[in-house]
């Protein structure tokens, strides 16, 4: 919905916060505005705040907290000096234990409101380290003439702007403590205006920075990047266009992988591949999912949206056979290599667009005992509507968006005769409003 900025009234107003929205903002209903909903950034339920309007629309307004008049007992002092400007985090002002409670509430609300379902059991939330956990991400880069410097960081609350960061406390320290050094370094380059973003990713062996550049780098800049990488412990890759243009600066690069020790599995990946950002919680999540799936040693399991084999290969240690299906052909190729590297001949992989008709494919016609799926934010409704669901004794659904999970849960329960046995939130992204969750379904 389009926002109107022409009618914004900047006069601070007092309001009481009634709830927390799915994106981490306080929810208020303004008197004198017909009880119109206003989403207030930086405010918590139970608080009374002075707020300033930032956007208007027909059905709701938006505002930011100017002053807290009555604070929630759950309010804490944010640890990061950039909180409130940088949009990388939105919940640092809320007690950590209460953050996951809020996410659990968002999940249950979505299941009831969108899917019209309730889990038989609410699973205890899965939590881990809350600082220095993020091993993959993307920094925006922008030369700002008014500040006479190059900014490196996440977007601000107003996404038109890049946050001026000196550090990031949620990113692994190998990267998060060096944001200011990266900013200063890029400012010294000839091509400082031609770098729009830098992607970072860490494996067990190395930390890689992939530098997106719009113009060819000068020889001096290439040499400078090489020196910067050596000084700060980064392996530098360059990207001049699409994913297929990514090349190591030194022409050799470095092998990247991470180990899943509980299953004696090592997963190799490339600098722009998808991996779960939170390494420790990823291990907890895999163990949790496998426990909930209850795989038998003589069973065949289907793993949809399998990526590099994050769930597939640990499953292969537990079952007779597992089949992984993924839409990204490059990830499928690496999943096959990972299976071979780990000596797992009982893991098969197929490349398929799971939003399209797959009913005539070889993998779809195979028989399975159980299903595990970890779809993108859009969910899995297209493939669920094609699968012969009656064959699955149990389904474990890992979700990165509670709304799409709720929709798909409604389909499984209300149209396909499944029971939502249990569901719960997982705090993959502490201090953000992102809700990762898991749900278990059984055929009635």
UniProtKB/Swiss-Prot annotation:
InterPro entries: 23S_rRNA_MeTrfase_RlmD (IPR001566), MeTrfase_TrmA_AS (IPR030390), MeTrfase_TrmA_CS (IPR030391), NA-bd_OB-fold (IPR012340), SAM-dependent_MTases_sf (IPR029063), TRAM_dom (IPR002792), U5_MeTrfase_fam (IPR010280). Catalyzes the formation of 5-methyl-uridine at position 1939 (m5U1939) in 23S rRNA. Pfam families: tRNA_U5-meth_tr. The active site is at residue 400. One of its GO terms (molecular function) is iron ion binding. SUPFAM superfamilies: Nucleic acid-binding proteins (SSF50249), S-adenosyl-L-methionine-dependent methyltransferases (SSF53335). S-adenosyl-L-methionine binds at residues 276, 305, 310, 326, 353, 374. PROSITE patterns: SAM_MT_RNA_M5U, TRAM, TRMA_1, TRMA_2. One of its GO terms (biological process) is rRNA base methylation. It is an enzyme of class 2 (transferase). The keyword Plastid does not apply. CDD domains: AdoMet_MTases (cd02440). Its EC number is 2.1.1.190. This is 23S rRNA (uracil(1939)-C(5))-methyltransferase RlmD. The keyword Metal-binding applies. Residues 5-67 form the TRAM domain. The gene is rlmD. [4Fe-4S] cluster binds at residues 80, 86, 89, 168. Keywords: 4Fe-4S, Iron, Iron-sulfur, Metal-binding, Methyltransferase, rRNA processing, S-adenosyl-L-methionine, Transferase. Belongs to the class I-like SAM-binding methyltransferase superfamily. RNA M5U methyltransferase family. RlmD subfamily.
């Amino acid at each position: 919905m389009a926002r109107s900025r022409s009618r914004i009234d900047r006069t601070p107003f007092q309001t009481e916060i009634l709830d927390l929205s799915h994106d981490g903002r306080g929810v208020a209903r303004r008197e004198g505005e017909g009880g119109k909903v206003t989403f207030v950034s930086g405010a918590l339920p139970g608080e009374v705040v002075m707020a300033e309007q930032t956007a208007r629309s027909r059905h709701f307004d938006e505002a930011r907290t100017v002053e807290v008049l009555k604070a929630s007992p759950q309010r804490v002092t944010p640890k990061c000096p950039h909180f409130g400007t940088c949009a990388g985090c939105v919940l640092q002002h809320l007690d950590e234990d209460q953050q996951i409670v809020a996410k659990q509430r968002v999940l249950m609300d979505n299941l009831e409101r969108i899917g019209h379902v309730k889990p038989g059991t609410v699973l205890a939330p899965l939590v881990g380290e809350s600082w220095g956990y993020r091993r993959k991400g993307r920094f925006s880069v922008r030369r700002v003439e008014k500040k006479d410097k190059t900014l490196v960081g996440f977007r601000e609350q107003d996404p038109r702007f890049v946050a001026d960061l000196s550090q990031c406390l949620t990113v692994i320290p190998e990267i998060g403590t060096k944001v200011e050094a990266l900013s200063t370094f890029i400012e010294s380059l000839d091509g400082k205006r031609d770098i729009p973003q830098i992607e970072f990713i860490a494996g067990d062996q190395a930390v890689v920075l992939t530098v997106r550049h719009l113009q060819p780098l000068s020889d001096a800049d290439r040499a400078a990047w090489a020196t910067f990488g050596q000084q700060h412990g980064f392996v530098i890759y360059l990207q001049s266009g699409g994913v297929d243009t990514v090349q190591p600066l030194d022409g050799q690069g470095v092998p990247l992988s991470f180990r899943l020790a509980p299953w004696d599995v090592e997963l190799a990946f490339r600098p722009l591949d998808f991996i779960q950002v939170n390494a420790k919680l990823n291990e907890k999540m895999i163990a949790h999912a496998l426990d909930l799936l209850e795989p038998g040693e003589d069973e065949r399991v289907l793993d949809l949206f399998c990526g590099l084999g994050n769930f597939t290969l640990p499953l292969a240690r537990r079952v007779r056979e597992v089949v992984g299906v993924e839409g990204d052909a490059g990830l499928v190729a690496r999943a096959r290599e990972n299976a071979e590297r780990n000596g797992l001949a009982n893991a098969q992989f197929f490349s398929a667009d799971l939003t399209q008709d797959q009913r005539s494919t070889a993998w779809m016609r195979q028989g399975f005992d159980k299903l595990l799926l970890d779809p993108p934010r859009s969910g899995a409704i297209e493939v669920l509507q094609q699968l012969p669901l009656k064959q699955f004794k149990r389904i474990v659904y890992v979700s990165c968006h509670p709304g799409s999970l709720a929709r798909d849960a409604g389909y499984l329960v209300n149209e396909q005769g499944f029971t939502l046995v249990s569901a719960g939130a997982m705090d993959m992204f502490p201090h953000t409003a992102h809700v990762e969750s898991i749900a278990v379904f059984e055929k009635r």
